């Protein structure tokens, strides 16, 4: 849990957890241009760390430089400003970001930062807004943000905002991120992208229990993976390396590729076999967002 000072003027060390898409099916394209999808989102105990300090002048300020992300377009600033305007909050905030997740990796880093901001400021500004209200704000910031506010592992539909909580077994994951940025919008616009996967139900997923044995290759797929691996040799190389060892899958629109293990030792043993210089992390599954209690 994050630490709050005695004067309740700050919240420190707030985790913005990464997510994995255990599968990702694209079932259609909506009139508004968004793609309809189905997925299961898995939270990880690995992510960026955010620190929030109250300001009395009402200003929202990001005090950490994030290369390539101007302050005014940063999702944490947009989230704080949106929440402030909605609630009529008079206080401001300084936001520090300890960026640990790679960008353009399919791990939800920016979206998770935004959700952690909404949850933390709901507590720090003493707004006491319900989770449903925060989720309605979250969807204005991006398709993945509502999941992180929802705060539980989930079966997702729509553009990712229609969520049902799902219990997943404890797992350790090895996540490998090639040093390439995959632009999500460009992948969604590719003509070769599958957009007609047959819809499933949450019952289908739970009945097959692919996550218990032989997963992740025993249930579904990531419809974006063939497109990304055909365009980015770095991602294809990681997928190929994993398949010589254990089943693996790309998360989101990439570039990260992951495999599941039953123990930390197994995940670290696989990590030790990676080629020198590859960017990787071992992380444990989580069942609930660390700031889940900051909204009702």
UniProtKB/Swiss-Prot annotation:
InterPro entries from the UniProt entry: GHMP_kinase_C_dom, GHMP_kinase_C_sf, GHMP_kinase_N_dom, IspE, Ribosomal_Su5_D2-typ_SF, Ribsml_uS5_D2-typ_fold_subgr
EC number of this enzyme: 2.7.1.148
Residue spans crossing the bilayer: none
Entries under Gene3D superfamilies matching the protein: 3.30.230.10, GHMP kinase, C-terminal domain
One of the protein's GO biological processes: isopentenyl diphosphate biosynthetic process, methylerythritol 4-phosphate pathway
Signal sequence, start to end: none
Residues that coordinate or bind ATP: 102-112
Function: Catalyzes the phosphorylation of the position 2 hydroxy group of 4-diphosphocytidyl-2C-methyl-D-erythritol.
Protein name: 4-diphosphocytidyl-2-C-methyl-D-erythritol kinase
Species name: Burkholderia mallei (strain ATCC 23344)
Gene: ispE
């Amino acid at each position: 849990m994050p630490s709050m000072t005695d004067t309740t003027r700050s919240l420190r060390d707030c985790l913005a957890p990464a997510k994995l898409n255990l599968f990702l099916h694209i079932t259609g394209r909506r009139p508004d241009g968004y793609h309809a999808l189905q997925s299961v989102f898995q939270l990880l105990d690995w992510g960026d760390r955010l620190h929030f300090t109250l300001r009395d002048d009402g200003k929202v300020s990001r005090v950490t430089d994030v290369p390539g992300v101007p302050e005014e377009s940063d999702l944490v600033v947009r989230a704080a400003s949106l929440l402030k305007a909605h609630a009529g909050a008079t206080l401001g905030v300084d936001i520090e970001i300890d960026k640990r997740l790679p960008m353009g990796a399919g791990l939800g880093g920016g979206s998770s930062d935004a959700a952690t901001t909404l949850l933390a400021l709901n507590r720090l500004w003493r707004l006491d807004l319900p989770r449903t209200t925060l989720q309605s704000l979250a969807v204005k910031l991006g398709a993945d943000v509502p999941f992180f506010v929802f705060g539980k592992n989930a079966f997702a539909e729509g553009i990712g905002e229609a969520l049902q909580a799902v219990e997943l077994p404890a797992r350790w994951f090895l996540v490998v991120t090639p040093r390439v940025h995959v632009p999500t919008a460009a992948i969604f616009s590719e003509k070769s992208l599958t957009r007609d996967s047959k819809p499933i139900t949450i019952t289908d997923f739970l009945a097959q229990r692919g996550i218990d044995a032989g997963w992740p290759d025993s249930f579904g797929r990531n419809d974006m993976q063939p497109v990304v691996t055909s365009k980015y040799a770095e991602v294809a190389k990681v997928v190929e390396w994993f398949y010589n060892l254990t089943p693996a899958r790309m998360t989101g629109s990439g570039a990260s590729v992951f495999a599941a293990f039953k123990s930390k030792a197994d995940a670290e043993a696989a990590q030790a076999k990676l080629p020198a210089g590859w960017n990787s992390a071992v992380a444990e599954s989580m069942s609930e967002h660390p700031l889940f209690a900051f909204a009702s």
